[in-house]
Amino acid sequence: MNHPTRKLHRLQTWDYSAPGYYFITICTKEKRCVLSSITDGQLRLTQIGAIAEKCWLRMNTVAPHITTDYYCVMPNHIHGIVVIGQHPPEAARSIPDLIHAYKSTVTREVNRLVPPEQRNQLWQSSYYDEIIRTEQMLLETRRYIEDNPRKWAEDDLFIYT
C-alpha cells in the first residue's frame, strides 16, 4: 500500500544541535484556542497556557548552553526563540529533541488535571522552525513575537472565538 509522503519541515542539510538562534512555532491540534485568549490586544493565559509557559521557561534548565529568548503563548500556538550556545559534542541537544521533550512535558502536566476520558491530543504532530542567521533577522523575529498579541486578528493562525 502506498502512503502519502510527509512533507519534511526541517532543512535536511542543517545540524539542529549547532549553536544558533532558532525561531519555533508550535500549534495546537486542529488549532484549538486552549492556551490563551486575547481581548483588546491583552493576552490572558488559560490554565493550559500557564503550564505551556512554565515548561517553555524550564527549557533554560535543560543544559547550560540552551536558553530561551523572546516567546509568546498565543491562543492556539506558541512562538519562541531557542538559543543553542557553544557546547562539547557529548552535550549536544537538537531542536527536534528539545521540542519533542517540551510537547511531551506539557501534555503530561495537562493530563494530570483532566480525567482520562476527557483527554485530547494537545499538539499538532510537527512544528515550524526557522534558523535565524543574521542580527537583523533576530531583531525582526523578536519584534514579530512581541507584536503578535496586538496583531492577533491579522495572524494566519487567527480563529475567532
Where do the protein language model's features map onto the residues?
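Short catalytic/metal-binding and nucleic-acid-binding patches
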Residues: 1-161
